[in-house]
Amino acid sequence: MTVVKGEGSISFAEASVEKYKNDAAFTNPLTIVGDGVVTYESSDPTVATVNATSGEVTIVGVGTTTITATITDTDEYAYEKKTASYELSVDPAINLAALSGDYIAQNGDVLTGTLAGNYKISIAAGASVELKDITINGVDDEAYKWAGLTCLYDANITITGANSVKGFYEDYPGIQAGPVGTTLTISGTGSLTATGGDDAAGIGSGYDGASCGDITICGGTVTASSAGYGAGIGSGYNASSGAITISGGTVYASSSMDGAGIGSGHKASCGDITISGGMVTASSGDWGAGIGSGFSGSSCGNITITGGTVNASSSSYGAGIGSGFSGSSCGAITISGGTVNANSGQYGAGIGSGSDSTFGSITITAGITQVQATRNYATAAWPIGKGFSDNDSGAVSIAGVTVTSKDWDGTGLTDLNFATSSTGSNNLTWTLTPKVP
């Protein structure tokens, strides 16, 4: 008697699988027709190993390997094709979604994915790390007192794709820059949105005595904001940060209230602010400067703009570029290049001091492309110079001409054109452009 065997077959659910190097063990389901016995093997065990009987794959390295299932004929079934296989590619990136605890990124790491747990993610001292489509959405919970991303010392962050980082708990920034004396550098072609809590910067330092080193942005699209009393980029409430340098990229920085868009937070300080390139938009909701110092005795170092396109505004009481409201200060303001538009909603100067505050000095040279400054308080504030109730600030020099009044009409200028415009009794704009030879 001739026994006719059934026609057996095997096939994997997926012909190819992509994983990250820290992903958990997995199984690509195998469909079996018949009762044959299957064994599994990996073509490159340095990339991944496979359990010979269950098919569970464990990732051990990066690269590509082929996982093969082999089946044998039985008394009941014959298999014309006795093997099935799929290609496994293991990306060297660290998948945040696969983490089961805190993680310190090392030099060369690529971070990707969405953080699933309430874990602290840090960057090791001196490490260069790529952020590639990450999401860290910190919960506002006192049990998790850390930033969305914490730099332990000097750090270089390259951004690719779209990235979003939010601090945990209200006292912590989206990205905590390293300690005093270190530098955080952000570059790349992607985007980064960094959001701090009520009392912290978007990028910089946190709350009440917190500090950080220097912050440099030279590429990418960076959006940084504080939900309350911190700067968008710089220091948090009653905190400090080092120098802030922007040489390229597109930067949007904002504080909801009391902090500067770029600079210091409420009762806080920051170092020098230098902008030499890029597209920069900075704003304060109330009482802080767009670029400069925040509210209530805050300070910042010198503000220097040599290039790029800069738009800076304060909704009320702070200067567009300069100092915030109520006993705040900034150092020397120098604008020698680029296109600048600075506006104070009320009581502050467009460029200079906020209400009841001071600046060191203002120097604008003939090397600019255009400077436009607007005040919105007629009785005292200057478009470029002093805000309301400022009796102590330094000199204002525009292309070598000393400006001594909010009523200046451009007299004495030889290298710059001067124009005024107004949209109402409180509003006054000065516009400076180079004279064409």
Walk through the language-model features, giving the residues of each:
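Solvent-exposed beta-strand/loop surfaces, strongest in extracytoplasmic domains of secreted
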Residues: M1-P92
